[in-house]
Amino acid sequence: EAAVEYIVNNYKGFHSETRMLKDALKTADNAIATKGIVEYKCSMGTTIALAIVSDYQMFYTWQGNVRIYLKNNNGLSILTSDHILNVGYGQTRVTRCIKGTGLREDIPVKVIKLTRNDNVFFCTDGFYNIAESMLSNKSITENKKAIIKPDDDVSLIQVNL
């Protein structure tokens, strides 16, 4: 929420989408620290994916194991890589997130050209772990119906151009 508000409030007149995305992540990192301490008296953290689309270019960044997919005439492709570490015994740990302790300096920001009728999907691990193959063939309504009782929180945002 803080990251989106930052972009909405500061985008006009801004000349670098890369800087805007990095600053939005830093704003979200500060906001989550404050909210955790003030409202819940504990540390909090979350994974995040953000994008700015301008003139059929998408600038995007992410922290953690959220994914951004592009579906177009060439098929379905994953645009992000998971920030996770396999710790053994089927367990993984997120290696990057926003949790109010500052961000690494090497925040990934990438850009990709888009065309009309492209679809971009933002997915949490709860979604892509059980439904990744559905993205290429079904609509968001069909995907929602297929997920009844997931083991993890499930979030999917679809953007159609």
Whereabouts are the PLM-identified features?
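PP2C/PPM-type serine/threonine phosphatase catalytic domain
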Residues: E1-L161
